[in-house]
């Protein structure tokens, strides 16, 4: 028997919803003509939520679900425009749009799960498995949309989403439907392929994607997700690389086997060896000068970002980094400033402590440490009007109880949907940043650019001496370029040897000093 997380029906709802399909369709069509997609989505989501909590025949619920589905399919892209590429934490219209998008996807999922449970319980099905397969497919589509909306808004996935997704796939596998095509229009779409898409998207660490990267990864998976395989047979070694564990019966996403840990109950193993091989071949072709996909862009920056993204996917799907240090809880106070101009000014050493603001410098915003390792921090914004942040931002931070300024890079977000400050993770780049100025060799001295030098022994967790690095304004310099460095009262030359990272408004290079 298929058991899913469903709300109980209300025998006497305070405000009974309209359930006559022609009336509902006319009402929705009128709402879709209104100028505010956010308000339309909110109202439609509320109506669907009420509909999901009253009893009715299967045929009527299916007809209503399809009407709501087509409306939601129209609204989701419009809602994304309000929150997919903005700074965080979300507020105002962006926050309302994100809430409406996730709510609408969640209620759509409930509508089809009601139908799937009813259809799965039928003992005699004269029409064959066609309707059952279509309902499994719709449930998978709704799950994908819940995840996409959550990832785009950097918000937690709603409770029981993963629990039900695993249960639906296990049900399809048990009934022998997981490899059946849904219909002639989508001859290559099966429940297993849709499930693989959601699993691989979750394994890619989507809360660390830059704006626009989620869509690129989703398109990549539409073509390549079948290179990954699902099996009940455990790998030879439980810590094997390119293997993920799918915890059927638990409400959380797949996790890499090489990270250890164990779960009770049944498991499915996701093997990504062939997918990793495809990624490696594509990276070799790009390194040899091969073309990027047409939708990526032809400029050098877009190409570099795409190559960096593929390398990250290879790392996450094949050899994800295992945690080297335990997280240590803390409640220390922190002040931060985001962006290269502010970080450069604070790197000059003019900020005294967490408790004292410095006149003439950009304002710092208050945060609190949630936990930390030698490699970085998880922080929570604590101000009533928290500062705006973006994934990939470079930040200067000063932690209560520590001497000196640190420089870090924001790696992930977690929104609360409450309009308050968000949680975010940052990777420590240096304990001893040094403000300097640089200009290309033979360029006029008046074109000096603010740069931040990260000394060779720049991180406390490093096991060897990595090359010194330099943070420069985006587009100011390039690899293998010689630059003149002004550090305090001294001048010297350096050659930029490797582009390591790039983020909003800056690039991070390795460099070699030249005598």
Where on the chain are the PLM-derived regions?
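Extended, domain-scale alpha-helical bundle/helix-rich regions
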Residues: 160-332
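Generic hydrophobic, helix-prone segments enriched in Leu/Val/Ile
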Residues: 48, 101-116, 220-222, 304-322, ...
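Short strand-loop-strand
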Residues: 299, 306-403, 412-435, 442-515
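Sequence-level detector for tyrosine residue identity
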Residues: 68, 73, 112, 151-154, ...
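Intrinsically disordered, low-complexity regions
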Residues: 6, 25-29, 41, 236, ...
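Generic N-terminal leader/targeting and pre-domain segments
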Residues: 1-160
């Amino acid at each position: 028997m298929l058991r899913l997380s469903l709300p109980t029906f209300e025998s006497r709802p305070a405000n009974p919803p309209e359930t006559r399909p022609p009336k509902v369709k006319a009402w929705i069509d009128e709402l879709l003509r209104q100028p505010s997609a956010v308000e339309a989505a909110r109202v439609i989501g509320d109506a669907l939520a009420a509909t999901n909590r009253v009893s009715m025949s299967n045929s009527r619920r299916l007809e209503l679900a399809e009407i709501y589905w087509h409306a939601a399919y129209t609204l989701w892209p419009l809602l994304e425009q309000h929150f997919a590429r903005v700074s965080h934490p979300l507020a105002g219209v962006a926050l309302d749009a994100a809430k409406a998008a996730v709510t609408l996807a969640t209620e759509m999922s409930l509508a089809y799960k009601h139908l799937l449970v009813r259809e799965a319980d039928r003992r005699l099905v004269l029409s064959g498995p066609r309707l059952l397969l279509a309902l499994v497919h719709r449930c998978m589509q709704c799950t994908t949309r819940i995840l996409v909306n959550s990832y785009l808004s950097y918000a937690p996935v709603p409770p029981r989403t993963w629990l039900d997704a695993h249960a639906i796939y296990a049900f399809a596998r048990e009934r022998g439907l997981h490899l059946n095509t849904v219909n002639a229009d989508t001859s290559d779409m099966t429940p297993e392929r849709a499930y693989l898409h959601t699993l691989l998207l979750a394994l890619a660490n989507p809360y660390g994607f830059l704006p626009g990267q989620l869509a690129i990864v989703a398109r990549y998976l539409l073509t390549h997700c079948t290179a990954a395989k699902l099996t009940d047979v455990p790998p030879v070694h439980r810590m094997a690389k390119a293997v993920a564990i799918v915890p059927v019966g638990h409400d959380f996403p797949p996790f890499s086997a090489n990270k250890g840990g164990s779960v009770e109950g049944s498991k499915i193993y996701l093997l990504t060896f062939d997918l990793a091989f495809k990624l490696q071949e594509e990276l070799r072709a790009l390194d040899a000068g091969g073309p990027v996909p047409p939708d990526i862009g032809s400029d050098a920056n877009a190409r570099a970002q795409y190559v960096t993204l593929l390398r990250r996917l290879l790392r996450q799907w094949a050899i994800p980094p295992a945690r080297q240090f335990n997280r240590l809880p803390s409640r220390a106070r922190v002040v931060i400033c985001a962006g290269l101009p502010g970080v450069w000014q604070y790197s000059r050493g003019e900020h005294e402590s967490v408790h004292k603001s410095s006149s003439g410098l950009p304002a710092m915003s208050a945060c609190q440490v949630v936990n930390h390792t030698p490699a970085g921090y998880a922080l929570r914004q604590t101000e009533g009007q928290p500062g705006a942040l973006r994934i990939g931002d470079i930040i200067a931070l000063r932690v209560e109880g520590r001497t000196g300024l640190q420089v870090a890079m924001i790696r992930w977000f977690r929104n609360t949907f409450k309009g308050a400050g968000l949680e975010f993770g940052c990777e420590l780049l240096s304990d001893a940043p040094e403000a300097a100025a640089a200009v290309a060799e033979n360029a006029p001295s008046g074109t000096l650019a603010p740069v931040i030098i990260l000394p060779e022994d720049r991180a406390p967790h490093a096991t060897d001496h990595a090359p010194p690095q330099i943070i420069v304004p985006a587009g100011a310099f390039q690899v293998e370029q010689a630059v003149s460095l002004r550090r305090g009262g001294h001048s010297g030359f350096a050659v930029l040897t490797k582009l390591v990272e790039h983020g909003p408004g800056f690039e991070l290079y390795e460099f070699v000093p030249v005598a």
